[in-house]
Amino acid sequence: MQTSLSANRILAGAIACVTSALNLFATMCSDGIDDFLRRLKESPPGAVFNPWWQVDKENDADRNAPAIRRRHLRAYLRKRLGSVKLVVIGEALGYRGGHFSGIPMTSERILLGKKKNDGIKPEHVFSSIKATRTSNCEECPDGFSEPTATIVWGSLLRLGREPQEFVLWNAFPWHSFNPRRGMLSNRMPTQKERSAGMSALKTFLNLFPCDKIVALGNVAASQLKELNVEFHRVRHPASGGAKLFRQQIKKVMNDLC
């Protein structure tokens, strides 16, 4: 009886230690994400939109939009902490994607469950909260759809990756737009703007340490090279690059297995 009681005490103590360690890890991870979100406040001036901390007065549904996008991003990142085997870095947020979803290379239609025919479900992105659209319904009744988002998510999922095993981000984390065309436009960030995004990119890579990093296109490759990070460069799927992207990302994924 005495031996049984001692064993139970040891087991209970071990469980308590493991639980305490897991709680500490979760707290540290949560703190890291919150610190990262605060770092994203530091967007450069000019024709740059910060979806997590600014309101798009012309196209947002209401003034709660930035807080909603922060919740989306937080849930997306938390789902992947400690599980990522592949990091994919794009160029910059697009107005059809992260501008309204708050998540790189992810459209509102993905979050709203309107890309299931492409094999992409909202729970692939996150499942801890319910997604909410932030764009007003007048401009795009079904929510915005971004071709790059659909191609990247669809390709990675079809190649058998679990959604929490890969994380998508951008070399320039904010949305650079054409000031003459307005918020609903995209442009390549300038070198000065890209330099302003380096700190956020470095912090992101520290949050998700990973041996396999993929750069979509030349801007992402240039930023990663400046950080002395090893990476695989693949064709960006935009502007007719979808076929080559799928071929190249498949090779990278095969090497990962």
Name what the model sees in each region.
Residues 29-212, 222, 227, 232:
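A polyanion-binding, active-site-adjacent surface
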Residues 229-255:
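Short, flexible loop segments at boundaries between secondary-structure elements
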Residues 218-219:
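Alpha-helix/helix-capping structural signal
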